[in-house]
Amino acid sequence: MTSAMEFRRPVPTDGEAILNALPNPVLLVAPDGRIVDANIAAESFFEISTQFLRRQSLKELVPFGSPLLALIEQVRTSGSPVNEYKVDLGTPRIGGDRQVDLHVAPLTERPGHIVVMLQERTIADKMDRQLTHRSAARSVIALAAMLAHEIKNPLSGIRGAAQLLEQQASSEDRLLTRLICDEADRIVTLVDRMEVFGDDRPVARGPVNIHSVLDHVKRLAQSGFARNVRFIEDYDPSLPPVLANQDQLIQVFLNLVKNAAEAVADLGTDAEIQLTTAFRPGVRLSVPGKKSRVSLPLEFCVKDNGSGVPEDLLPNLFDPFVTTKQTGSGLGLALVAKIVGDHGGIIECESQPRKTTFRVLDADVQRRQATRPKQPR
């Protein structure tokens, strides 16, 4: 297992330190199109090291005809900065389209050099959509909790009546009374699961080592449903403990890993699940009920190389009864989203064929003065 923290970097200058403190990718492009400087956020965005970025031409990182190339030429010609919003920016390395806001400006001290800052919109947009869904779901959850009690009472009567009939029924009719009892039990089980969504009691929390949780989930998976799947771990050992309920975190990641295992079940020896943790400073958003913006510095990911989630399901993937499985109830991911939300965090999914990522961003972190203590893996 390796992490970015284990690689030694040269001591940055003041200017480099300021650039690396920015949460958004920043590039400095020379007149010939080469990237001569990049910050650490650019390393994460393009999924290659800054040392490699500094040897590349920008044309090798973005598709032919990319609007970014045209904007750079426009700024170089006019000498004036340009902002462009909601630009689809794909890269040959990571594939697909990533929607970003582009801020392009000339560097007056170095003629012909252009500064490019990219601000990715997908995470922010998904967070806003998830918070909107969470707020709208509260009324539905309240209705479900009220109906749960009203549904159980008549079901109990129906089941009791079926049992009485069963005592005097013929063998053929007993099959029908047993069917009535089984279906009543199935509805009660479904109602019980729905009642979980109406549970708004405070979550009992304490310091939790996230790597211990992930290791526990991995062992459970490898001894059962993911016995033939190859696991890859990429952990940041410097992460602080999470202020959370350990049992609920295990439930979250066990559900995500089980979904990933089902997604790669037909890949045989190529089946792969990756577990990653990272510290992402600068991710902040406003949450209903809180006056200040909340910091979400911890990132925990479950990735798989399965066929991916259908694009039309992605926006509503964490809503109840949304599922890609013929026999699924569609409540697993909805419960995961509820638990993460109860902890003050956000969960999102990015998916394309051979690369699906479930990302949990956590808001409740135990901070220890100015440093982040190391914890064992």
Curated annotation (Swiss-Prot):
One of its GO terms (molecular function) is hydrolase activity. Residues 146-366 form the Histidine kinase domain. SMART domains: HATPase_c, HisKA, PAS. GO terms for cellular component: cytoplasm. The keyword Ion transport does not apply. InterPro entries: HATPase_C_sf (IPR036890), His_kinase_dom (IPR005467), HisK_dim/P_dom (IPR003661), HisK_dim/P_sf (IPR036097), PAS (IPR000014), PAS-like_dom_sf (IPR035965), PAS_fold (IPR013767), Sig_transdc_His_kin-like_C (IPR004358). It catalyses: ATP + protein L-histidine = ADP + protein N-phospho-L-histidine. Coiled coil: none annotated. Keywords: ATP-binding, Cytoplasm, Hydrolase, Kinase, Nitrogen fixation, Nucleotide-binding, Phosphoprotein, Transferase, Two-component regulatory system. Autophosphorylated. Pfam families: HATPase_c, HisKA, PAS. It comes from the Bacteria. The modification Phosphohistidine is found at H149. Residues 13-80 form the PAS domain. Disulfide bonds: none annotated. GO terms for biological process: nitrogen fixation; regulation of DNA-templated transcription. Member of the two-component regulatory system NtrB/NtrC, which controls expression of the nitrogen-regulated (ntr) genes in response to nitrogen limitation. Under conditions of nitrogen limitation, NtrB autophosphorylates and transfers the phosphoryl group to NtrC. In the presence of nitrogen, acts as a phosphatase that dephosphorylates and inactivates NtrC. This is Sensory histidine kinase/phosphatase NtrB. It comes from Bradyrhizobium sp. (strain RP501 Parasponia). The lineage of its organism: Bacteria, Pseudomonadati, Pseudomonadota, Alphaproteobacteria, Hyphomicrobiales. The gene is ntrB.
